[in-house]
C-alpha cells in the first residue's frame, strides 16, 4: 500500500489497518517458526506496510 493512499484515509481507518497488519505479521511469524512459510519476503513487506501506517498516523497527529 502506498503512503499517498494511506494519507487519504481517516485515523480510525488507519488504526484498523494497523491492527490488521499486526495480526497478519503475527500469523506470518508463526508460520515461519513452524516451517510452513515458503514466501519469506512477505514478512518484510508487512513490516514496511506497518511502518508506513505508523508514519502517516504520526503525521496526522502532528497536524
Curated annotation (Swiss-Prot):
**Keyword list, A-Z:** Ribonucleoprotein, Ribosomal protein
Task: Give GO terms for biological process.
Answer: translation
GO cellular component terms?
Answer: cytosolic large ribosomal subunit
List, alphabetically, the InterPro entries matched.
Ribosomal_protein_uL29, Ribosomal_uL29, Ribosomal_uL29_CS, Ribosomal_uL29_sf
| Keyword Isomerase attached | no
Which molecular-function annotations from GO does this UniProt entry contain? structural constituent of ribosome
* Source organism superkingdom: Bacteria
- The cysteines joined by S-S bonds are none
One Pfam match, by short name? Answer: Ribosomal_L29
Cross-referenced NCBIfam families: L29
- What family is this protein classified in? Belongs to the universal ribosomal protein uL29 family.
Q: What is this protein called?
A: Large ribosomal subunit protein uL29
